From Swiss-Prot:
GN (gene name): trm61
Disordered: annotated segments: 75-109, 356-390, 423-474
GO-annotated biological processes: tRNA methylation
Source species of the chain: Aspergillus oryzae (strain ATCC 42149 / RIB 40) (Yellow koji mold)
Function text: Catalytic subunit of tRNA (adenine-N(1)-)-methyltransferase, which catalyzes the formation of N(1)-methyladenine at position 58 (m1A58) in initiator methionyl-tRNA.
Name of the protein this chain belongs to: tRNA (adenine(58)-N(1))-methyltransferase catalytic subunit trm61
Recorded superkingdom: Eukaryota
Pfam families: GCD14
GO cellular component: nucleus; tRNA (m1A) methyltransferase complex
Record's keyword terms, sorted: Methyltransferase, Nucleus, S-adenosyl-L-methionine, Transferase, tRNA processing
UniProt record similarity statement: Belongs to the class I-like SAM-binding methyltransferase superfamily. TRM61 family.
Length: 474
């Protein structure tokens, strides 16, 4: 089964996840099915009811992604009508064959509203998922995955699955093909996410979502207390190592789990880290006291490049504001004097019109108001500007009010690959270099080198002084 998060295809399919976008900030996730086993009763099959109308799933299946779906007329009262429990004798005789599920009734379009059918992405899933715990939003996990060097083929350890937001984002980052039972033609490392959750109910819900979204084999959810049992897959003592390249700890006390993330565990068990590459780690902590204890433990365990980052993402809306009396009733403009000169000119034009009106009222033989002069028309009329419309006005910026992230501190660190003298010797034999000179004999100290250089200078001075004495004797 292919996941709609990774390979959605061009059309929606049955038994797959789809996102129903009602507004910009309102999206409903649903599994497309013709029949709803839990909430039956609709003649049209499974129906999703929204404030913009009812949408039978028969109208959502096999539709191109991004389509606009019109609401349908659904008999909502049919769900409350109970079927007759007693049947006549002739009905009992005729019911010898097994009853199949009735085919959904063809819906009729309504004028209540519409929605857009979208395929799921980690960004849309984060905005629409059911919140069970604190959610890692897009501004946070995008930066975290960048700093963790998550790429196709990597293995990520996630401690604290929660609502599954980071799980879906990380599996997309490391995806490098679906696992299969066939023997691969070439050696290729498939990406994988190993998620650990302490709460049993949350772990089960994440496991169900992973199954529904077609991520089996790419995400492995484990119910475990990582503080005590570590990060091995299967049995905590004799389990298999995930050989992780990146680690994300969303825990209340991440420093308690760092003792299991070492190259050589003291208990003699296998390390969960990849021995052939450096390992990147990130911890998600809301308090500075947690950050201090985490950094102290990281330094004791040999982690390098430790840094702390706080992500403050804010969306900025940029637009042009046009102000002036000559714009008329154009949408998005402010009909107000843009300067003092324009206000004075407008006042003078109104005074001239008032004087002209009073002058015509005093004339006894005047039947109608005369037409304004050409000068007044030029002043009072609108003048077309030579500046294009998209360049008119001032550039205005407004920041987003509601920030979809959390005030938390991200701690990053790197654990280098373990390197021994045997590894150094093997690499020098495999890739020799003429510039590297092997030291011969025992190394000399600085004092010994200074003494030898002083003796060498004294010897040179003696050799220079001998020819001078011989010439004087002659």
């Amino acid at each position: 089964m292919h996941s709609p998060f990774l390979t959605p295809g061009s059309r929606s399919q049955l038994d797959n996840l789809a996102l129903l976008q009602l507004r910009r900030d309102q999206t409903i996730p649903t599994i497309l099915q013709l029949h709803d086993e839990k909430n039956g009763g609709y003649k049209e099959g499974k129906v999703t009811n929204t404030r913009f109308g009812s949408f039978p799933h028969i109208t959502l299946c096999d539709q191109p992604w991004g389509s606009q779906i019109i609401a349908s007329k659904v008999d909502t009262g049919s769900r409350g009508r109970t079927q007759k429990m007693k049947r006549k004798a002739d009905e009992l005789d005729s019911s010898t064959q097994a009853e199949d599920k009735p085919s959904p009734q063809t819906p009729v379009a309504a004028s209540s509203g519409f929605l857009h059918l979208l395929y799921p992405t980690p960004e849309l899933w984060t905005a629409s998922l059911p919140h069970r715990t604190q959610v890692v939003y897009t501004p946070d996990y995008s930066y975290i995955l960048h700093r963790l060097r998550a790429r196709p083929g990597s293995t990520v350890i996630e401690a604290g699955a929660g609502s599954g937001s980071f799980t879906h984002a990380s599996v997309r980052a490391v995806f490098n093909g679906y696992p299969s039972d066939d023997q691969p033609t070439k050696k290729r490392r498939l990406g994988k996410v190993c998620s650990f959750e302490f709460h049993a109910q949350r772990a089960e819900k994440v496991r169900v979502e992973v199954n529904q979204h077609g991520l089996d084999g790419l995400v492995e959810v484990t119910h475990r207390d990582v503080y005590e049992d570590g990060f091995l897959l299967g049995d905590p003592k004799t389990g298999k190592s995930p050989k992780a390249n990146a680690i994300f700890l969303d825990l209340p006390a991440p420093w308690l789990a760092l003792k299991h993330l070492v190259r050589n565990p003291p208990e003699g068990t296998e390390s969960p880290l990849d021995p052939t590459s450096p390992v990147y780690i990130c911890t998600f902590s809301p308090c500075l006291e947690q950050v201090q204890r985490t950094i102290s433990t990281l330094r004791q365990l040999g982690w390098l490049g430790i840094s702390m980052v706080e992500v403050n993402n804010r969306r900025i809306e940029v637009k042009r504001e046009r102000v002036g009396l000559d714009l008329g009733n154009i949408r998005g403009t402010v009909v107000f004097p843009k300067s003092v000169d324009e206000a004075v000119e407008r006042t003078r034009a109104l005074e001239e019109r008032a004087q002209l009106f009073r002058a015509t009222q005093n004339q006894s033989d005047g039947d109608s108001t005369p037409a304004p002069k050409a000068e007044n028309e030029a002043k009072g009329g609108q003048q077309e500007s030579e500046v294009p419309v998209y360049k008119q006005g001032r550039v205005m910026t407004r920041s987003e009010l509601d920030l979809k992230n959390h005030t938390s501190y991200l701690v990053f660190a790197i654990l280098p690959r373990e390197w021994t003298e045997e590894d150094e010797k093997r690499c020098r034999e495999k890739w020799p270099s003429n510039r590297v000179q092997e030291p011969q004999g025992p190394q000399k100290s600085k004092k010994q080198l200074k003494r030898e250089s002083r003796e060498k200078r004294d010897l040179q001075r003696k050799e220079q002084s001998q020819p001078e004495t011989e010439s004087q004797k002659e």
